[in-house]
């Protein structure tokens, strides 16, 4: 599973997920991308589940690019613990995903293969997603 090697601070505030994504809103590396349509915290194990299901669908061919990284720690206090005594221990890591963010990209596969792989990966995620193609801009314009 993905997590940072080290961070400046062990724990973070929760923050807010308002507005659209600030960056990462276009297909940069592959031919097709999976875009988030809703805001959410995507856990590191959900990212890994998507990677596994897509790589199994492609078998040998195709390259998968993971465009999100879980860099936010989420803490949790133990069950049946009284309030107080500080913030809980880090339970898991999440990536803050806002609408319009390209989460995964694939290359070296057909459009049908990419569509099916993204459909399977979308079932592993807690948000609505859609597939987008890479936009090729003409240099003459």
UniProtKB/Swiss-Prot annotation:
Pfam families the record matches: Ribosomal_L16 (PF00252)
Gene3D superfamilies attached to this UniProt entry: Ribosomal protein L10e/L16
GO molecular function, one term: structural constituent of ribosome
Keyword Repeat found: no
Any single Gene Ontology cellular-component annotation: cytosolic large ribosomal subunit
CDD domains, sorted: Ribosomal_L16_L10e
Presence of the UniProt keyword Ribonucleoprotein in the record: yes
Keyword terms, alphabetized: Ribonucleoprotein, Ribosomal protein, RNA-binding, rRNA-binding, tRNA-binding
Residues of the signal peptide: none
Paired cysteines (S-S): none
Listed GO biological process terms: translation
Family membership: Belongs to the universal ribosomal protein uL16 family.
Subunit structure: Part of the 50S ribosomal subunit.
Record's function text: Binds 23S rRNA and is also seen to make contacts with the A and possibly P site tRNAs.
PANTHER family documented for this protein: 50S/60S RIBOSOMAL PROTEIN L16, LARGE RIBOSOMAL SUBUNIT PROTEIN UL16M
Protein known as: Large ribosomal subunit protein uL16
Organism: Deinococcus geothermalis (strain DSM 11300 / CIP 105573 / AG-3a)
Higher taxonomy: Bacteria, Thermotogati, Deinococcota, Deinococci, Deinococcales
Primary gene name: rplP
């Amino acid at each position: 599973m993905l997590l940072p090697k080290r961070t400046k601070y062990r724990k973070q505030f929760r923050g807010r997920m308002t507005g659209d994504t600030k960056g990462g809103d276009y297909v940069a590396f592959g031919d097709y991308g999976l875009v988030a349509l809703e805001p959410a915290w995507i856990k590191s194990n959900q990212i890994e589940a998507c990677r596994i299901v897509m790589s199994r669908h492609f078998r040998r061919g195709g390259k998968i690019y993971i465009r999100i990284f879980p860099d936010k720690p989420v803490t949790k206090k133990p069950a049946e613990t009284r309030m107080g005594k500080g913030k809980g221990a880090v339970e898991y890591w999440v990536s803050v995903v806002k609408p319009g963010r390209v989460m995964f990209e694939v290359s070296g596969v057909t459009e049908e293969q990419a569509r099916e792989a993204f459909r399977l990966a979308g079932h592993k995620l807690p948000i609505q997603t859609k597939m987008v193609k890479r936009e090729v801009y003409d240099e003459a314009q």
